[in-house]
Amino acid sequence: MFEIAKKYMPGGVNSPVRAFKSVEMEPIFVKSAKKSKLIDINNKEYIDYIQSWGALILGHAHEEVVEEIKKQAELGTSYGLCHELEVEMARLIVKHIPSVEMVRMVNSGTEAVMSAIRLARAYTNRELIVKFEGCYHGHSDGLLVKAGSGALTFGTPSSKGVTEKIVSNTLVARYNDIESVKELFDKYGENIACVIVEPVAGNMGVVLPKQGFLEGLREITKEYGSLLIFDEVITGFRVSINGAQGYYNVFPDITTLGKIIGGGLPVGAYGGRKEIMELISPQGPVYQAGTLSGNPLTLAAGIKTIKIIENDPDFYSKLDELGKYFEEGIVSALGDFDVKINRIKSMLSFFFSKQEVDSYEKVINSDVEIYKKLFKCLFENGILLPPSPFESLFISSSHTKEDIEKTVYYFEKFSKKLKEGKV
């Protein structure tokens, strides 16, 4: 199938990481997926820790979500006009994401970030933006500068086709290094429109913010009249129902969302303070539009997902317990090796490294060759990790202790083979 795919699609895929190139393998083609498992076209079953790159916090094909999609499909798949689900989704986002007073729906995280930055520039009447090494904010030109995720593996610090003129307005600081931010503001502060950051980096693997880092960003941006943008495409409704901002109690001016709020369908959103959001067309001068923005199928799935979370007061604590169980199992299995695990709730990464991994530099200096061997070993035994050492693992509410135990068993088998020099 891959050979056929390569005839019609660049590299045979629609997103680079799916090619499995980083682990020196060919991709699988999925036939179906349910709960924590997926089945490929050869009828091989896998326990899936990709979960659509974090979009499926309830797992694949959750019965209630699927039913909502079916019901909405009977009523129409797209209107290109206003409908009640848009209002309900906006209400839920404003209810749960502390810094958001108004929100605009779009179709992807990339689109949300593009729009948020345009809005920040309009609000501040400034041009420069600050991003961080290893943080990925989609594939828009101005942000493909030392980007994380797929660009860590396949790109150079700036992708071909991105001109120097476009990226000349993008300043790059070091994640978890507040002094590097202060240096940029000392030099360019009066011209910086915004700082955009993943509050928990999730696209160079999971890298948690050091104590005081997010607070420092909030303080500096306020001092200079710049806006702080949290890219919560991954962390929104993942680390808590209030996102990372609620978890860390640091509140940005603008938030971008995606993944979970679409219930597994294409989605994006950006929101913030009312005075900022009212600059968006048709109320204000900042133009942004989309034929499929606020798509009813997507919003039906997303609303149902959020309501399922709302109705279970123990939802996140149960996910955290599973995440902790998985983390402890990996530590036990790989205890004879230099491995560092970064986890927050139901997203985690492990790095083969002698030092704590809290920066882009330490991420890229970890041993990716061991990860490739681990990926292949687990893959052969029906365990699907992300096909890149620079991506996060995601646990859904459909994963079970039995799933975790089976996975840890094969971690142990790999550890034994590695010690014996058999991989």
UniProtKB/Swiss-Prot annotation:
An annotated GO BP: protoporphyrinogen IX biosynthetic process
Cell location: Cytoplasm
Keywords carried by this UniProt record: Cytoplasm, Isomerase, Porphyrin biosynthesis, Pyridoxal phosphate
Enzyme category, top tier: isomerase
Keyword Cytoplasm found: yes
Subunit text: Homodimer.
Family of this protein: Belongs to the class-III pyridoxal-phosphate-dependent aminotransferase family. HemL subfamily.
The name this protein goes by in its record: Glutamate-1-semialdehyde 2,1-aminomutase
Gene that encodes the chain: hemL
